[in-house]
Every structure is written in C-alpha cells, then in structure tokens.
Curated annotation (Swiss-Prot):
Localization in the cell: Cytoplasm
Pfam family, one: Adenylsucc_synt
Cofactor binding summary note: Binds 1 Mg(2+) ion per subunit.
Domain of life of the native organism: Bacteria
Enzyme class: ligase
Name of protein: Adenylosuccinate synthetase
Required cofactor names: Mg(2+)
Lineage, highest ranks first: Bacteria, Pseudomonadati, Pseudomonadota, Gammaproteobacteria, Chromatiales
Binding site for substrate: S300, T301, T302, G303, R304, A305, R306
Gene designation: purA
PROSITE patterns: ADENYLOSUCCIN_SYN_1, ADENYLOSUCCIN_SYN_2
Pathway membership, UniProt: Purine metabolism; AMP biosynthesis via de novo pathway; AMP from IMP: step 1/2
GO terms for cellular component: cytoplasm
A GO term, aspect molecular function: adenylosuccinate synthase activity
Length: 430
C-alpha cells in the first residue's frame, strides 16, 4: 500500500524543502503543491547543476513523476509560462506531466500593483512581502471576488468579472495609494492569450488523488514557506497569506486528512528568517555573518540576505505539534562544521517569566529572549557524509539532543546541496 506524505518547512521557510522533495520523489508517483504561489523558491542541485523552481512542483525533474498544482495555490499565468519555458529549454517535458486545478485563484497584474503600493505606503513598517501579488490574490479569494483559472476558459465571463474587480482595485490604487490605474484591455488580452496553452493542463486534482490512493501509489505534498509563516499559526502579521501547515495540504488539494500517512518537518541545523518579524535567536555579530556566509543565505526568490541565528527548539516544538510531524529532516548540518561551541535555544525569557512554548502574536514574541544550552561543536567535515556512523561524535550528540527536546525522531540529515548528500534513517514512503 502506498503512502501520502507531506513535506513542509518547520521554521520561517528556506529550510531546504526542494532538495528533500526531489530526493524522495524517486519513490513517488506524484507531487502536489497545495499553497502559496511563485513567492516560493525551491532550489535543487542535481549532479552539480542548480535549478530554482518557484511554482512548479520539485518532482518535475524526476522522469515519470506527475506534478499537480492544487486549488490552494494562487497561480500567476505569466510566471507559470515563464517557468515552463525555462524548463522546456533544458529538455524537461513539462506539459506531459504538469496538471492544474481549475479552482486555483489567478494572480493578475493589479495584484502586483497593489502589493507594491502597500509595501511602499507602510514604509519602515513594511512586512517584507516578495511583491508578487500573493497577498492581494488571497484577499480576493476570501472576499469572493477573485478570478479562478477555470474562468479564463470562458471569454465573456472572464471579461465581465475582470471589469468588476478591476474597477474596485483601480479605485483603491488611484484614490488611496495615488498610483497609476491598471489597464483593463491589456490585462484581458494578456490573460486570454494564455488560455489555449493552459486549458489542456487542467485536471480534477481531488479525483486524481483518489485514483492514486486506490492504486496504492506514493504521493508527496510539497509545502512552501514554513510553519512560522502560517497565516493563522505564524508570527502574525509578519506571515504569508496561506496555511503553510499540514492541514493546508488537505484544504489546498482536496485530499482527506485521514489519507495523510506521514509528515516530514524540514529544519535547518540553525535558524534563518527573511524579511521583518520577531526572531529570538537572531545573531547580530560575527557568528551571524559566518552562518550567512557558510550557508549561502540569500533568498532564491528575492535575493535578499537572510537573517541568521542559533537553533530554536522552542519554535520547532510548536511546529511539531501544529503539524503532527512524524519525523524531522535536519538540513545544512555541514554549515556548523568547525565551530568550537553551539547554542541551542531551549526556552524563552519574557520579562520575569520563562516559557517553553512561543507566545501568541508578534508583539509578545518580539519581547522574548532566548535561554540557551551550550553544546560542543566539531572540527571534522560532515559535507557529503551519507552514513550516520560516519558523522562526528559531537554532531551526533547535537542531533540527539534536538531529537530529545523536540520529541520526534530525526529521520533524515542533509549534509550538502546535492540530492545524494543525504543520510536517510527512515524513509517517509517505507
């Protein structure tokens, strides 16, 4: 009997999900994206060749793996076509294996204009969005005025709906943000021009998942961003606009919760964050710079430098609980090579009180100071190690301590960017 497994980030994103999904899809029949949009940046390195995917599931580089974009994703037709063209130029037969839910909300040019105008208006209080229209598209979805992929295949219906929603957004752009209006005819023509290409890719994703379940196939659900950026459970308002947690795999694809057999939480051996928001273990000294330099911590979507800090076990415990995480994959262990000592955050101090769980909301979170437990580092290299017994003793102790604090096993360890630089202790599909 096959398994349905979820792979998601258990920190603030950028944990290395793309590589792990790519590795695990060797045993998968299909990979499903269920939330987010082209604000994701999943980096894969295969035989030294680097590929960055923003929208298309990471399984696209595995021959024969079906790739689906579920209804929970906000879809930019323009970004999708660009990514398809890049992959096809490299010989990847994207159209043979990519399938789209017609219930995907569309990201259109006015969403991008709104996103940029809002961030500019916030000034120093900016959230740090990617400026790609993700948030405004999700707003339209919740307010029930959004256009969906299925609308694109009905010219008159699409034009009528577009006219209504664009009147609304242009009023806001012009009269509130003092920005330029978005041209109706230009958006209409650009969108309809893509309909013929996209329509053959449409599939009833929930029904296909039911078929795969009945066939006993392995299916991977690929999360984007990370648990601490979840719209409900993250450090609100410094969050993304979707549910990045395991529950989002169900609502964003149409699979039932009892069909999920395993949840793999991806976590770096340290912690990073992009953009604004509280980050208790953030390092502002030479050590923070060292982690950023060794870990090549620059966003694959925005190019922005990531903030770096020590491992935060408090935040990870919350992520484990919210997602019912079955096992952890610890990535970038090799970045810690050569350090004399390491710090593990095992609690928070907020004023006179100490906490073993994160407080609710960004304001309270921002007042927390980390309570550290010091551990010895290791001088040996872990880069490319593929067997647990070949890891340095102190690296093993570090992983065992994380496992002990968090309460779930470390099932995988990543020791480098290539798919083969991985230690698999328990496979999600076995």
């Amino acid at each position: 009997m096959g398994k349905f497994a979820v792979v998601l980030g258990s920190q603030w994103g950028d944990e290395g999900k793309g590589k792990v999904v790519d590795l695990l899809t060797e045993n998968a029949a299909a990979v499903v994206r269920f939330q987010g949009g082209h604000n994701a940046g999943h980096t894969l390195v295969i035989d030294g060749k680097k590929t960055v995917l923003h929208l298309i599931p990471s399984g696209i580089l595995r021959e024969g793996v079906e790739c689906m974009i579920g209804n929970g994703v906000v879809l930019s037709p323009e970004a999708l076509m660009k990514e398809m063209a890049q992959l096809e130029a490299e010989g990847v037969p994207v159209r043979d294996r990519l399938r789209l839910s017609e219930s995907c909300q569309l990201i259109l040019p006015y969403h991008v204009s709104l996103d940029l105008a809002r961030e500019q208006a916030r000034g120093k209080a900016a959230i740090g969005t990617t400026g790609r229209g993700i948030g405004p598209a999700y707003e339209d979805k919740v307010s029930r005025r959004g256009l969906r992929l299925g609308d694109l295949f009905h010219r008159e219906r699409f034009a009528a709906k577009l006219g209504e929603v664009l009147d609304y957004h242009n009023f806001v752009l012009q009269h509130y943000f003092k920005s330029e209006a978005v041209d109706f005819q230009q958006v209409l023509d650009q969108s309809l021009a893509l309909a013929e290409t996209l329509q053959p890719l449409v599939m009833d994703v929930p029904e296909r998942l039911r078929e795969l379940r009945a066939q006993g196939a392995n299916v991977m659900f690929e999360g984007a961003q990370g648990t601490l950026l979840d719209i409900d459970h993250g450090t609100y308002p410094f969050v993304t606009s979707s549910n990045t947690t395991a529950g989002g795999a169900c609502t964003g694809s149409g699979v039932g919760p009892l069909d999920l057999d395993y949840v793999l939480g991806i976590t770096k051996a340290y912690t990073t964050r992009v953009g604004a928001g509280p980050f208790p273990t953030e390092l502002f000294d030479a050590m923070g710079e060292h982690l950023a330099r060794r870990g090549h911590e620059f966003g694959s979507t925005t190019g922005r430098a990531r903030r770096c800090g020590w491992f935060d076990a408090v935040a990870l415990r919350r992520a484990v609980a919210i997602n019912s995480i079955s096992g952890l994959c610890v990535t970038k262990l090799d970045v810690l090579d050569g350090l004399e000592t390491l710090q593990l955050c095992v609690g928070y101090r907020c004023g006179d009180a100490e906490f073993s769980v994160p407080p609710a909301g960004a304001d309270a979170f921002a007042t927390c100071e980390p309570i550290y437990e010091e551990m010895p580092g290791w001088q040996e290299s872990t880069l490319g190690v593929t067997r647990r017994e070949d890891l340095p003793v102190n690296a093993l102790r570090y992983l065992e301590r994380i496992q002990e604090i968090i309460g779930v096993p470390v099932d995988m360890i990543s020791t480098g960017p290539d798919r083969d630089q991985t230690i698999v202790l328990r496979h999600p599909f076995e």
